[in-house]
Every structure is written in C-alpha cells, then in structure tokens.
Amino acid sequence: MTRPRGPAPRDGAAWRRDPARRVLLRDAVRGREGGLRLACAVMAGLIVSGGVACAQDSHMAVAGAPATAVAPPGQPAPMPPATVADAAHLAHAAAVLELLLDQGYYWLGQHNLGKAHETIQRALSIEPDNNEALFLQGRLQMAEGGTTQATRTLERLERQGAPAGLVAQLKAQIQAGPVDPRALAEARALAASGRMMPAMFKYKALFRNGDPPPDLALEYYRVLGATILGYQEARTRLAAWVARNPRDIDARLCLDRILTYRVTSRAEGLDGLRALARSNVSAQIRSDAVAAWRDALLWEPITGQSIPLYDEWLAQHPDDTEFTIRLKKAQETQAGVDAANDRQQGYALLSRHMLDAAAREFHRAVDIDPHDPDALGGLGLVAQARQQPALARQYFLQAMQAGPDAAGHWRAALKALETGGGGVDPLVARIVQAINAGRYDAARADLATLGRRPGYGLTVLSLQAALARRQGDTADAVRLYREVVRRAPRDAGALFSLGALDVQVGDATEAADILTRLQRLAPAMARRLEAMMLSAQADRAGDDDGRIALLRRAQALDPDDPWVRLKLAHALDDAGDHAAAQAMMDALTAPRNASAQALQAGIIYAMGRHDTATAGALLERMPRTGRTPDMDRLASLVVLDQRIAALNHAPVAGNAAVLALADQPDPTGERGMRIAAALLARHAPQDARQALARGESLTQPPTPARMLAYAGTYLRLRSAFDTTRCLDAFDAMAKARPADVTADQARARQQVAIGLAIMTADGFDRYGRTAQAAQVLAPVLRAHPDSVEAHLAMGRVYQTRNMATRALEEDETALRLKPANIYALAAAARDAGGAHHLAQAKGYATRLAHEDPDGPMSWEVRSDIERIEGNSRGQLADVEHARHAQCTLDGEGECGGHESFVSDYRWPLIDSEYMDLHGATLPASYHYIPEDDGAQAMDRQIVYLRDSVSPQFDANTFVRSRTGVAGLGQLTEFAVPITATLPFESWDHRLSFSVTPTLLFTGDPLTNAVSAHQFGTVAVNGARPWGYHHYYTQGVGLSLNYVNRWFAADVGSSPLGFPITNVVGGLEFAPRLTRNLGLRISGGRRMVTDSELSYAGERDPGTGKLWGGVTRLFGHGALEWSARGWNAYAGGGFAYLGGTNVIGNTETEAGAGGSATVWQDHDRQWLRVGLDLMYFGYKRNAYFFTWGQGGYFSPRQYFGAMVPVEWSGHNRRWTWFLRGEAGYQYYHSNAAPYFPTSAQLQGQADGSPPSYYGDSGASGLAGNMRGRLVYQLDHRLRIGLEGGYSRAGSWSETSGMWMAHYTLDGQ
C-alpha cells in the first residue's frame, strides 16, 4: 500500500505536489520541520519553476558571502556554485526520502516486516521528525505486536501536529489492537492454497465481521474479491478506497486485478493493469501489474476476440512462447468462425433467393478456407439458381473432393443438376421459416399445399416431423422421422433428428444403432449425437463425480454445445467447484461473437447464481435475432430480480411491495418461485404462499413447468398439502403427454417427492411417532437407495428412537454415497456424539470443517460436541460463530444483538419446586420451536446459553399456612430465600449459596384446656406463668449447594435463631444408564417442617426444657424413564427420624407413576395427564405435641392413588404452569402414649387421663392444586406469582409465593 495523502497537507509531503508554491510560501515551510525541509523545498522549486526567486529579505542573505550582481529585470539572479551544489545535494536527499517512504508503504502492504523496518529506519535517518516516516514506524510497531511503542509514536505525532489523517489511521489501528497471529496465519495459509472461500470466513472471524485494520485491508480485499460471495463487496470497497486515496497505487493494482476476475469487468481491469505496467511507479508495482495482466489474458478464451489482446501483449513481450501459440490458435479459430458465419449467412440469403449477396458470403468463406465443402457447395447452389450448370457442376465436384464425409449430399445435388432438377423451392423455404418463427398454422397450411405436389413426399414428411418436434409432440415426431429414415436410410439429417428424439425419450437401443450408422455417414453429426447420449447418461448418474466425468466427455465431443457446458457447470457447482464452473461459463460467453444460445445459457447460469448484474450484461449483448420467446421470458426474470434487489436496498420496502410483483401470469412458475423466495428471505411465509396463489389464479390452464416449480416452493414452505396437490397436477399432465417431460423435470419431480416424504417423516419424528416416520421412509429408500437425504432422514428417526448406533450407520451410508456432503458429515458427527463415540464425532467434525470451514454448520456441529461434553461456554462461542457465519451468507453483514431482547426467546424453568433453605428458582430452559428458521433457532439457543452460564440471583417471598389446632398442628411460615448461583462451564456445573430469613407462627396452646393438656408436660406439670403466649420463632437458614452434572451435594443449617438448630445436607447421584433410563440415588439429613415443633423446636411450659427440631436421615433410590412425550418412575426408600428429646422413628416408602402429553399446541402449550401411586408407613405415630412426640404426620400406613393433570405454556413474555391432582387416599395411624420417652411422666399421666392418643384413620378423596405465572420484564429480570392448596391425610395446606429472578448476562 502506498501512503495516503490528504487534501491539505500541513507538512513537507505537500511540497512534493507543488514545490514552486512552497518556495513562494517559504515562511510556511520553515519551522518545526527544520532546515533540511526548507532547503529541499527551495531546490525542488528551482527544479520545477526553472528559476530562482529573488530573496529580498535580509534574513535570507548568507553572512560573509560575496555580493552578487543584480540581474536585469525579468532575468533570474545567478546563484553561487556552492549554493547550487548544496541545493542539488539536498534535492537528491529529498528524492531518496520520497522513494524510501514509497517503499515503506509497499513493504508494509506486502507484510515484509524486515524490509519495511530497514526502509523506515533509513527514512528516519534522513529526517528523524518526518511525519509520514513516523506514521509508518507506528504501523510497523503494531504489526510487530508493539502496542506500547506504537502508542508512544502516536503521541509524538500528535505533539508534532501531524496531519489528522495520519493520526486517525494510526489511532484506529492501535484501538483495533493486534490480531491473533495464529488465526491470521491460518487465513493466509488457506489463501495461499487457493481456498479463498474458507480464507474469507477466517478473515471475517479474525476481524469480528467488522472492517479490517488498514495494514490488512488490501490483503483481505484480495481474498474477498476472489470469492463468489465477496466479489461485489471487495470491488465496492476497493473502489471507494481508491476514490479516497487516488495515489494509493497498491490499492489501484488490487482493484484492477479483482476487476479481471469477472468477464463483465475484465476489460476495465485490463485497462488499469496496462496503465500501471507502463507508468512511472515502483518496479515492484510494475512487475505485479504485468503479472496480473498476463494472468488475466490466460483467462480469455482462445478466440478471435482475444487476438488484439494477444497482439498488444506480444508487442511488449515478443519472447512469450505461450502467447505466440495462443495467438496462432485464436487466428485459426477466428478463421473458422468467420467462415462458418459467412457460410451460414450465405445459406440464409440463398433461401431468400438473394443470389448475389449469397455468392459474396460463400466466396468470403472460401477465401478463409479454400477446402470448405459447405461453402463450395453453396456456390454450386448459387450457380445452379443462376442457370450456370457448368459452374455449378465444378463447385459440386470440388465440394465432394473437399469433404468426403458429406460427398453423398453434394453427389445428390450433382445428380439433380444433371437430371434437370431445379434450385431451392421458395415454398419449402417459407415453411421452414414459419416453423422456426412459431407460426405453426401457416406452416401446416403450406405443408398441405406442398403435399399436393408430386415428388415432394419425403420433403413433406421431414417438414412434418420438424413441425411435430417443435410443437412438443415427440411421439408423432419419432413416428415421422422413422418413416423418413425407412424411405431414405442414408439421410443423415433425419437419422440425427431421430437419434436426438430417442435420447430424449430414453430409447437407448435405437439411439445406439443410429449412432453407428451416423459414424459412417456423417461423423460430425455422430459426435454431436454421442455427446447428447452422454449428457442423458449424466442426468441418470448417481454421484457427482460420475456425472461430471460423463459431461466432460460430452463437452470434448461437442465443445460448441452451450447446453452441455451449462449442465457441466451446474454439476461442478453441485460438487462444490464453483470457481471451475464460473470459469467455464465465462469462457462460453466471453467472445464478442458468442452465439445467442451461448448467451442464453450464460444468462440462465448467472440467474441461478443470483448474479443479476452479469445476467443483465449478457442480456444487453443478445442480438435481436436471438430474442426468442424463451429469451423474452428470461429477460423478464432478470428485470424481476433487479426490482426485488432494489426493494431490498435501504430503505427496505415492505413485504407488500414485493408481493405486488406477482401481478402477471406465470406459465413456467419461475416468477412466482422468485417472488416467494424473496418473501421467505424476509421471513414472511404467509406472503410467499399468497404470491404463489396469485400466480396460480393468473395462469390458466396450469402448465407442467409451473406446477413442478410451485411444488418445490411449497415444499420449502413446508406445506405438504399444496406440494402434493401440485405434484398430482404435474403427474396428470405428464401422463397425458409423457413426451413433454424432460429429464431435468423428471429428476426434479423425483427430488420433490423425496423431499415431501422426508418432510412428512420428519413431522412424525418430531412428535415421537417414529413408526409412522419409518413407514414413510422405507419405500423411498427401496426406490432410491442412493438418496443421501433419505438415509439422513432415516438416521434422524433412529436418533429419536435413541438408537444412536443405527442412526450413525445411516449417516455413514450417506457418506459412502457422497463423502464430502456436509449434511451427512454433520449428522454423523452428531450421532457419533450421541453414541458417546466422541473421538469419532470429533473426526467427522474435523472433516466437516475441512469441507466447510467457518460455515454455519461446522460451528453448529462443534457446539453440539461441546454440549455433549458439558461445556456450555464453548458451546455458546461456537453458536455465536455459526450465527455470524449465517449472517454473512445471508448478506446481512454484522449480526446485531437484538436477539438478546426478544422476549419469546426466554423461557424460565416454570415447574421448579420450592425447597426449604433454597427457595424456588427460575433459571432459563431451552425449547426447540419447529417454526423457527435456522437463524431464529440459533438466536434462541444463544440467548439460553448466555443466560445459563451467567451469574444469577433468585429471591422469593414464601407464605405457607397449615391447618390444625392453634398452638399445636397449626402453622404459618413466612420465608424470604435469596439465592446466588454461579455457573462454571455450564448450568449443569454450578455453585449456589442461599440465605433464608424465616418466621414461624402458631397459636397459644394454653388458651384452651384440651390443647393445653396435649402440649409439652402440661398434663402432669401444669404451665409456668411465662408459658402463656403465642408461640412463634424466627431465624436465618443457610445453604450451600453444588451441582456437577449427575452429582449434587448441599450442606447448610436450619434457621439460626430457632430454638433448636440442626446441620442438614445431602448427596445425590443421578447417572444416565441409557439415553432414556436414569438411576437416582439420594441420601442425607433434612428438616421436617410439618409443624413448628418439628421444624424449630419449642420450650415446654411445664419444665422449661426444649424438645422437637426433628430431622429425617434418609436414603432413596429410583429408576426413571423419560422419552419424548411420556415418562415413568419407580422407587423406594428408608428413613430414620429423630430430634431433641423426641422418640426415634423409622419410615419406609415406595412409589411409582408416570405421565404423558395428551395435547400440545405448536410446541408452546402442553397438557399432560398422569398417575401416581404412593405408599409410606412409620413405625410410630408421632403426630402429637406432648413431651417426646415429634409433631409430624406419621401414619402406620398410607396408600394413595392420584391422577395429576398439568397445563403449561408460554406466550411472548408470559409463562405459566397449572397442576391439579385428585385421587383416593387411605391412611391409618396407631395409638400412642402421651409421653413415649418418659415412663415416669407417662405413669403420672395415667393417673389423670386421657394419657393415650387413640388410633385413627380415614379414606376418601385427596388432592392438591398449584399454579404459577411468570412475566419477563426485560432480558435480565423476570418475576412470578404462585399459589397452591393441598389436602392429604388429616391436614390441609395453602401456600403463596412471589418470585424474582435476575441474570447478570453482561448484555
């Protein structure tokens, strides 16, 4: 890169532009730049102006110098020799400095830091304070990683008052910081190996999808311009760069080189390269321009169009042997083209009986090639028409001698001449013209007239066959051509036409026989027919390599057939070789005299690549004679694409403006398909459907092409009904006229049908109906065992069935069919990970990265592997890379951060349970929504992952009220748990700390004689005066919780401040035995919170002693099965319960149950129904409040069967949960003594009964209800409310809770 120059320089760079002006403004020059700058300016002024300014000021005189004579007016004053010598020396120094600065810019642009350092140091040795040299030094320091040194250099420039442009550029580079050297080396290695597309994505990731730093800009644009996706961006940005910096020669060179990459701009690029090669710039720039000039010429086709370019090159490089050979070949090719053009024009003129003009064209052809049999024969026909039989005979004989292969044709003409036959029949010529122009009724009328003439029977048959073929009546055309061949077995033209039709209808046997006959009669026609047969075989090839090989053979046989080239280009695109495909089509359309068919094929290819600019340029080159109805249709599509592109430019028009384009008939379906695709790109599927509906209503009757095109578009819209409808309509029309269906249409219909089956199967699979999905795919795989997509779809079915190994087998089958298929590689990597073959998964991911480096799918697969390994932070980074890559592919540029604020993307874990000492938290949960497109799904995942790895806080206000006798079983709890959670690499590995202020309220048991008798030791000791009060307590509970995937542990204490405090905690192991089956084993010590006595402990009003504070020491095990749509569990456990001055007790429990989703709405609402069976039993009944009892529900037996019904859902900011449970319960509690831990107290109580609690029990209905509603206030804060009611055993309970969750997500 050469150095930029601002419009108004303040330093010495300016005098290089206008030295004479600087001499006159010497005061402006003198100053901080020093004497060298002044002297250099003076000398440069002398050189440019040719004279010396007369110094009038005394301070300009040199002290001690001899006086000089005053020059006459108008004459420059002579200078002393010493002054002249000094000035010359200083001018030389200025020139050296100029050269060194230019070289410094160049070597920095080339990233040759060693040479750049040497050059810049030499410049600074000449002028240490030179602003540009210091600017270059700062850039070099940044390139070497010396940010601190570069900052000091920047400060020095600011102190010197350097130009603002230099300061701003260096400041921007310092702020951008050094780039990752490893990633930069990888990007450069990719570019050096010619893999420009992967290199482009690597550079974009390196620059975070932003602008490149100045020292890497040209390097990046070179790579960007060599890619299909980045060419236009590189061209636009480089053009703007050069416009801002017109003297940046390196950028000019880069732009000109990139312009030569496309045929439409190659001439402009060549002009620029030639100018640079001949200009007075540095030798390296000239050398690079010459090399780029030569490379561009190598891309030019070897045709007559390139002859002037070759001549110009060889005039300066006469020893270039390769271009000498190319020039000779181009001249030969052009001679052949000119001869062919003259010959064709001659025959056209002959058909209109313009004999003189026809003779001139034939003579031109013969001048080029004296042995051209067709031109010689044409001259014979002209002579015959002029009634010159001797001359006609001479030309026919010469034609027979010049072309033995076509001798039979001219022999027949000679025979007709000798027997007195006439020339070209005007009626035949008129019929041919009418058929070619599409005037079929006129052609039929003239055919009827011709058929009445004697001796024209064979001609009429041939013309009828041509008419039938042109109208698409293939069966009748085959019948007619067979009759022509039967009557004239050596008619090469009829044989060729019949063979071409056989290829079209798939009659390979007859086509092969005709090929054999043509090889003897007309080898050139035989080669064309063989090329058609190979092209048809390519249509049926099962793999890209085989298809490409067949098409290359076809192209070698018939290199001038544009349609074979178009097929080959499409095959190369399918195989991923886009550069070769583009080069092939450029070579086809580059010649100035490219045929109309070649231009048409180029337009079709360009439109398929969404290259509207190239399509429009080729359309402008189309001659009027080539503007067939097909070309007019293509032209309308080009205009449509241009209008859509204009509507998508800022300011972007609304969807209605795009939909309004569907305002005219659409017989081929391409118009509606393009409009629908544009609306789909805007995420407007309903508008896309409306566009297709308009196309159908405006085009009646339907055509096969349109119905097939619409079927494919409806498939993209995931509309199975409309896809099936369009396919059925296409099949009905194809059945009525089977010959009308081309091989391409048949293949497209097959692919749409396969896609429809896969979409149907995926729909079943999504909701767990894998049996139906497999039934849909099985016949597809039998009929199309080479369908990669079908194998991948079956793999997804197996994956849903948790048969990861079988899924991987299907993926590997697909990979055997197409080893480089990125979708198969992605599926194999995911399924290998699902089978826990992580090494294999990473191997497939590596292969995918090789095929699609930095593509969205590569990053998504990496994120899946990170997920399997439990690394959500790595997964988040990978998904963000995937999202940015997708934005780049979609042309959106840098992705915005708005997705973080989409309320629908945040779904809290709505059914989290309230846990003592911890509360109920509202962490993020992830939900897959089938309606999401790829970008939305990634945004949703990014939001979830950001939240799940961010520190977060939860706070609750919890109130619970339990029924019972005041002062005994009655309890009101008020708790405010506050929990801080710190995730590590994922939410499954986290640490939480909770603080829970808690207040418990119960009544005064002593206010009632019955309740007083059942409390503490009052029954035998009475109550002391201080005992008469409402019993309440308060404290603060603490808890530390650790989770690491399938392991969890917690430790804490019951609220500090309660009468009795206990250390509590637990462990849980929950490994997955299979994908569906899990084992859960837990144990620990927990509080029993049935009453204030069991929860906090109380003081006996009779003795003043404490009792209560019960804890449960438990162990529990369960097996849990979870599958899509349903789950089940079964387990049991044992516990020991004890407390302060409380009788010990044991519990056994068991339970089983499950639930299933019975209804869901668009994956946003669910209704689940289940069944829960439970049993528990205690050794003792301790649900009393006298001394030694525990105050907790403890029946001898409890059986319950409950049917839960649960409705949950999410809508924008709202998430809810409502669960109701009802069923049958039976329980029985044993009798118990008043004082189970003291025989003495019990003995005293026996003296004043009652001293025993009787047994009790009940059966009947039980149930509970709980509901929760959560609202997302913003991307960090959500709040919620919960209410619940339970009735079980002999008690009921009501609860309510307010909830808040705050995430420190850094957004």
UniProtKB/Swiss-Prot annotation:
One GO biological process term: cellulose biosynthetic process
SMART domains the record matches: TPR (SM00028)
Topology relative to the membrane: Peripheral membrane protein
Known pathway: Glycan metabolism; bacterial cellulose biosynthesis
TPR repeat boundaries on the chain: 97-130, 270-303, 339-372, 374-406, 458-491, 493-525, 528-561, 754-787, 788-821
Subcellular location: Cell outer membrane
Domain of life of the source: Bacteria
Signal peptide region: 1-55
Any one Gene Ontology cellular component term annotated for this protein: cell outer membrane
Repeat as UniProt keyword: yes
UniProt key word Membrane: yes
Protein keywords: Cell outer membrane, Cellulose biosynthesis, Membrane, Repeat, Signal, TPR repeat
Role, per record: Required for maximal bacterial cellulose synthesis.
Sequence similarity: Belongs to the AcsC/BcsC family.
Protein's name according to its UniProt entry: Cellulose synthase 2 operon protein C
Name of the gene: bcsCII
